[in-house]
């Protein structure tokens, strides 16, 4: 067996017969391709929240498996099934998180007001989402940058300055500490409790810092990395008070969305500095302690599906509206945009900037383009904490 392993390794390195399991692969054994697709569909159907990337190197009935996955169950099922199919398997699949590259610290706390999270570990890569200061995350691997998973399940890459790695004990201490919640859209934390003091950092709505006391008009707060700052009490609330006053009704959430009118569209943005369409939904809801999936195509399959009547009479304020292209005989339905219904045929969304438009031809805000690509709606508010992907910081496992 050892001889086989060394021989196969030589083949892999010298001959280069590695095959990736992709839909258009013509040389992968059909039975292996089917198995790969079945396992991916079961354990990692959405690559934005789970990874199952495996390359196969074949020599007759010998196969070397290389790659990585976030699911040990997927890896085990692949190896066991291949062996049952008669293959001699050399398993070199890495299971994430990669504790070795992370030096054992597989948890972290976001350390910037708005941390840009990218599709690859480099500044030139696409920004796919953002994370907010104080947000707990899971660290997956380190390659100069940190690959991490946010509380909505999204996988992405952060620069080292964006996240503070912690032990389980430090993570639990952070989650258990009394917080100060930033409630203004944008401001600053200062080194001293006065407006002309030097700045520690900027802050945005939804940021969470540890409560360390009060001095005059200021909260004293601490950061994940131990820095200390002062935030105006008029721009934040203690978490206990914030929870007592928390409102999760449609009217309050729509008011928060309206307070972002004019904020520029930013691809990948999920903060008051800039939002994309789904980022506006996520930001507006998160300010009311509601966590929803990141992208419009993920948000579309939460809550209760609502078919839209011609007169829009079956819609309620707070419903999410989804836009895109309808299914055809050769193409699946595709969701590319999301908005929030306000009532009276009006909706708020981010397209160029955050704005209000209408489905009513008699309304000065009439938007025929989006009316023409309207698909369906989803009613999410009644399903908070009743569906796995709709939760709050009180129930989401990342915050425990």
Task: Say what each PLM segment does.
Residues 5-9, 13, 17, 21-130, ...:
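N-terminal targeting leaders
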Residues 64, 75, 128-159, 201-233:
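SH3/SH3-like beta-barrel superfamily modules
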Residues 64-68, 240-244, 264-272:
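Second-shell loop/turn segments in exported
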Residues 76-101, 122, 150-184, 194, ...:
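Boundary regions of SH3-family modules and the immediately adjacent low-complexity/disordered segments
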Residues 110-133, 182-211, 265:
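Beta-loop motif signature
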Residues 139, 211, 322-323, 349:
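A generic structural signal for residues embedded in beta-strands
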Residues 165-168, 187, 194-197, 237-240, ...:
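Aromatic- and glycine-rich peptidoglycan recognition patches
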Residues 265-279, 283-317:
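Catalytic cysteine-centered active-site loop
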């Amino acid at each position: 067996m050892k001889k086989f392993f060394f021989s196969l390794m030589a083949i892999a390195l010298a001959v280069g017969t590695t095959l990736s399991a992709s839909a258009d692969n013509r040389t992968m054994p059909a039975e292996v391709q089917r198995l790969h697709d079945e396992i991916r569909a079961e354990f990692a159907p959405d690559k934005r929240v789970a990874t199952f990337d495996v390359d196969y190197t074949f020599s007759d009935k010998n196969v070397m498996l290389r790659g990585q996955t976030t699911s040990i169950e997927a890896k085990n099922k692949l190896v066991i099934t291949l062996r049952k199919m008669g293959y001699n398997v050399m398993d070199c699949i890495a299971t994430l998180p990669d504790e070795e590259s992370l030096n054992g610290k597989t948890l972290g706390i976001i350390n910037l007001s708005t941390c840009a999270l990218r599709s690859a570990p480099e500044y030139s890569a696409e920004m796919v989402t953002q994370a907010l200061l104080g947000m707990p995350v899971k660290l997956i691997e380190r390659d100069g940058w940190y690959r991490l998973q946010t509380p909505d399940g999204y996988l992405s890459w952060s620069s080292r300055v964006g996240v503070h790695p912690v032990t389980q004990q430090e993570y639990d201490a952070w989650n258990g500490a009394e917080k100060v919640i930033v409630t203004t859209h944008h401001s600053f934390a200062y080194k001293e409790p006065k407006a002309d003091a030097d700045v520690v950092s900027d802050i945005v709505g939804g940021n969470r810092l540890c409560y360390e006391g009060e001095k005059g008009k200021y909260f004293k707060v601490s950061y994940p990395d131990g820095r200390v700052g002062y935030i105006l009490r008029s721009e934040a609330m203690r978490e206990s008070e914030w929870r007592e006053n928390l409102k999760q009704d449609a009217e309050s959430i729509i008011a928060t969305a309206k307070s972002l009118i004019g904020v520029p569209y930013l691809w990948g943005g999920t903060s008051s500095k800039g939002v994309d369409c789904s980022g506006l939904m996520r930001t507006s809801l998160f300010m009311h302690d509601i966590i929803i999936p990141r992208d419009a195509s993920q948000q579309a399959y939460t809550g209760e599906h609502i078919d839209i009547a011609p007169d829009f009479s079956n819609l309620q304020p707070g419903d999410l509206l989804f836009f895109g292209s309808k299914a055809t005989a050769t193409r699946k339905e595709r969701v590319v945009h999301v908005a929030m219904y306000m009532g009276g045929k009006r909706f708020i969304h981010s397209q160029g900037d955050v704005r209000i438009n209408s489905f009513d031809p008699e309304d000065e805000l009439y938007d025929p383009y989006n009316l023409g690509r309207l698909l369906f709606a989803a009613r999410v508010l009644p399903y908070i904490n009743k569906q796995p992907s709709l939760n709050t910081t009180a129930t989401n496992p990342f915050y425990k």
